[in-house]
Design a protein with these regions (language model features):
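Short, acidic Ser/Thr/Gly-rich low-complexity loop/linker segments typical of extracellular
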Residues: 53-69
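Short acidic/polar hinge/loop motifs at secondary-structure boundaries
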Residues: 73, 99, 187-215
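N-terminal periplasmic accessory domains that precede
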Residues: 110-112, 154-156, 196-199, 213, ...
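Surface-exposed extracellular loop regions of Gram-negative outer-membrane beta-barrel proteins
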Residues: 233-248, 287, 291-294, 304, 524-526, 555-601, 616-635, 756-769, ...
């Protein structure tokens, strides 16, 4: 605790020093102005130079902002020229201008640039970015102009991302490892894996600008997420005015689907207002088959269960915010986001029970009716100060989030043998109302120590309270009423406080970039099972170092090396010790004694001409949190829980190659080969180890038919793999899409076909020799969609600032989500 207090005091001292250094020298002045294009609209990112009037030597340099304005501060008294340069336009010189004690601030008249025809003849301006870009610390998937963006959901697009795989429940893995932290515009999603899958299924691909895959995050990020961070950046709308877009789409697989929404952005000199709403209706079919053999010394029982499920779900996502520009250096903002998800489902279940395959001595006919509602709201208040032109910045975020969930499942079970009903129907219900509250705040500070060296520092705190009130009800046929079963009901309250601080130092040499960081996180938690009168407390302090090194070997060759240590804390709901019934013979329960898992990751990367990118990685995770499926031979049931397996070692090789084959055909291919090995000294009362060499492959082919029409074909293949006690069969699919623009790209129509050949399904068996089961799931993956989008207003409006709020680590741990 003493070390942590010293670290916090050091950071606060640095922030105080920044405010002192921000004082303006009274012996200097400032020169400012604005640049316009040929249409007299603001010209962003023009190169502006400040020259000495005597010898024309450069004194300072800058770029115009999105509103076309620029400013040189802390300029010594004297005579100066101003130069303006943009490729494709004639170069402009203005001045001389005299700064003195009588005139220390000079505001120049706006300068209108004139196109240079000679330059334009030799310049090809290409605005569309490649689908995949490799940057120093991340891989960027530019979704905005992809034909498969519209007609696919965010979850569909993630599945096509390099090195990313999504399982049947929507759990996301990166390079063969689970535990990914998902962010939206650098902000937390505040959701469990289940809720997150539901949100991503409801989010339209047309709203996404790009997806960032960060496999080895720096100390600036929360230490949670052993396989890294996926940041989904939504589209933004750079001058004053109003713009937006509306879209509507429909699709059909087994059932009809529909979606619609709009975005709006309005920017003035002092403020920017933005918002978006999208709505989706999705009815889908899902089949689940479970074949299980229960062996004892006395008998052998086979359970052969088939289930057909139809789900209806209505989702709405909304966001509104405002940025207020106090001046050109300071901005304060507020963002409100929310979602509503309402759904119901009906599952018809047939279970054959006997000693011979496909022949049941008895059977259970079941019907499961489910009704659910989930709502969530997050509030973010933020402040950013660009203290000087050298890169000194201060950023502050405060967040509050509240989530409410309610799901009720009703089970009707009828028992038959020899064609006759053998006993009275068994009817029961379970309900899972839950409330999650999150308060968090953080401060980030950047200070340039030298020209090519900077310091980053920050502090953060978060407080989380969850309340899960699980209820189990039996139907009393005598009174014709539902009665609470106190032996199967439970209230579980979980409180957690995490305090963190970090330091990062970045240094650039000739062809070399180095970054060293250290993050400290102190965790205090308490889980309270009210019904069982059981309290589990944990208090611990951890340090998370990170190192990044990149070397340009030559013009076409570069190499990188990185290391980081990370943590994964259990989902809040996974700590709840009480039983949740999936059906009559399958149930799951939490483990209050789950410990966090820790991962040390190493990566070696190589890039050739930024087109062939190779990464070799190794990680070791201790106390791995893994979902296990085990049999209760006495009760002849299958139960699902989470346990800390001893160790996971992961080796992975990733090769990515975006290649333009011709002017009209480009391709991007990504191959990840990985070997995950799990070892435990005791699982199901015996030592256990598993491992398998696996791979996944993604390919995307883009064909430009003409200036307004694109065709895309994409596919993926995930080989057989082992994760913990689960042996997962291969998964694969092929998608295609066609995009056509009209009305100078204001109107767009896209057609998309997901899983064209209806190949996608999931098969899971046990990797434990003592367990014998097969879980097979086929969902409605073959869907054909059509979407129309219309954009209105100016195409150059600067949208909302992207914020990284203060609760990234808490985002994916909220439990009780719906799908």
């Amino acid at each position: 605790m003493k070390k942590f207090t010293i670290l916090l005091s050091t950071l606060l001292g640095i922030c105080s020093l920044a405010l002192v250094n921000a004082q303006t020298n009274i012996n200097t002045g400032a020169i400012s102005g604005k640049v316009l294009d040929e249409k007299r609209e603001a010209f962003p990112y023009a190169t502006i130079g400040l020259l000495n009037a005597k010898d024309s030597l450069a004194i300072q340099g800058t770029l115009t902002k999105e509103n076309g304005q620029y400013e040189f501060k802390d300029v010594s008294m004297g005579s100066y020229l101003v130069s303006i340069y943009v490729v494709g336009y004639k170069k402009v010189f203005k001045g001389p201008y005299e700064l003195n004690s009588a005139k220390s601030k000079i505001q120049l008249e706006a300068v209108q640039l004139v196109p240079d025809a000679k330059q334009l003849q030799g310049v090809d301006i290409v605005k569309q970015k490649p689908l995949v870009e490799r940057q120093l610390d991340k891989t960027v998937l530019n979704v905005e102009n992809s034909t498969l963006a519209v007609g696919n959901t965010a979850l569909d697009i993630l599945e096509k991302s390099p090195g990313v795989s999504v399982d049947k429940d929507g759990n996301i893995s990166l390079r063969g490892k689970q535990g990914v932290t998902i962010m939206l515009d650098g902000k937390p999603t505040y959701l469990s894996s289940e809720q997150l899958a539901n949100l991503l299924r409801s989010m339209e691909g047309s709203a996404i600008k790009s997806i960032e895959l960060i496999t080895n995050p720096s100390a600036k990020y929360d230490a949670s997420g052993n396989s890294g961070i996926i940041n989904i950046k939504l589209k933004k709308n750079s001058n004053f005015g109003t713009n937006g877009s509306v879209f509507a789409g429909s699709g059909y697989g087994t059932y009809y689907k529909a979606n619609s929404g709009f975005t709006l952005n309005h920017r003035k000199a002092k403020f920017n207002v933005f918002g978006n709403v999208d709505y989706g209706r999705n009815k889908r079919f899902n089949s689940l088959d479970i074949y299980r053999v229960n062996n004892t010394l006395l008998d052998r029982t086979i359970f052969d269960q088939t289930s057909d499920n139809i789900r209806n779900r209505n989702n709405s996502n909304y966001k509104a915010g405002i940025d207020y520009f106090l001046n050109d250096k300071n901005t304060i903002g507020f963002v409100f986001t929310g979602y509503n998800s309402n759904g119901d489902s009906q599952a018809d279940i047939l279970t054959l029970i006997g000693s011979t395959p496909a022949v049941g001595d008895s059977s259970v006919v079941g019907k499961n009716l489910s009704d659910s509602k989930y709502t969530g709201q997050t509030y973010n208040l933020n402040y950013k100060s660009s203290i000087d032109t050298l890169g000194q910045e201060l950023s502050i975020d405060a967040d509050y989030a509240r989530y409410n969930g309610r799901e009720v499942n009703a089970f009707d079970n009828l028992y038959f043998a020899g064609g006759q009903q053998t006993r009275a129907p068994y009817l029961f219900q379970n309900g899972t109302p839950s409330v999650v509250k999150i308060w968090s705040g953080k401060i980030d500070y950047t200070y340039p120590l030298q020209k090519d060296m900077k310091l980053e520092a920050g502090i953060k705190t978060s407080i989380v309270t969850t309340d899960n009130d699980y209820r189990f009800l039996n139907f009393n046929s005598g009174t014709n009423q539902w009665e609470n079963d106190v032996t199967r009901s439970n209230q579980f309250i979980y409180d957690e406080n995490i305090n963190a601080a970090y330091l990062n130092v970045n240094k650039k040499f000739k062809g070399t970039s180095v970054q060293i960081g250290l993050r400290a996180e102190q965790t205090n938690s308490k889980g309270n099972s009210i019904t069982e009168s059981r309290i589990v407390k944990r208090d611990y302090l951890n340090f998370f170092p990170s190192v990044f090194l990149n070397q340009d070997l030559s013009k076409n060759h570069s190499m990188g090396l990185s290391y980081s240590r990370r943590i994964d804390r259990p989902d809040y709901g996974s700590l709840n010790p009480f039983i949740y019934y999936v059906d009559l013979y399958t149930y799951q329960f939490g483990n209050p004694f789950l410990k966090p898992q820790y991962t040390n990751s190493f990566e070696l990367s190589y890039s050739f001409k930024k087109t062939l990118n190779t990464t070799l990685g190794y990680s070791r995770t201790s106390d791995v949190i893994t979902e296990v499926l085990l049999s209760d031979t006495a009760k002849k049931t299958l139960f699902i829980s989470n346990e800390n397996l001893a160790t996971q070692k992961s080796y992975n090789l990733n090769i990515s190659s975006p290649l333009p084959i011709t002017k009209w055909w480009s391709t991007n291919n990504n191959l990840t080969v990985y070997y995950n090995r799990f070892e435990s000294p005791s699982l199901a009362n015996a030592p256990y180890e598993s491992g398998r060499l696996s791979f996944n492959f993604n390919t995307n082919q883009t064909i430009t038919l003409n200036s307004t029409t694109n065709f895309e074909l994409s596919g993926y293949y995930v080989s057989k793999q082992v994760y913990g006690t689960l042996l997962i069969d291969p998964m694969y699919a092929i998608d295609m899409g066609l995009s056509k623009n009209f009305m100078d790209k204001k109107l767009n129509i896209k057609l998309a076909a997901n899983d064209v050949f209806n190949l996608r399904e999931s098969k899971i068996t046990s990797a434990l020799p003592s367990q014998n089961y097969l879980v097979k799931q086929k969902w409605e993956s073959q869907v054909f969609r059509a979407t129309i989008t219309y954009r209105f207003g100016s195409n150059n409006i600067k949208g909302a600032r992207e914020r990284s709020s203060s609760a990234d680590a808490e985002a994916k741990r909220v439990k009780s989500g719906a799908q």
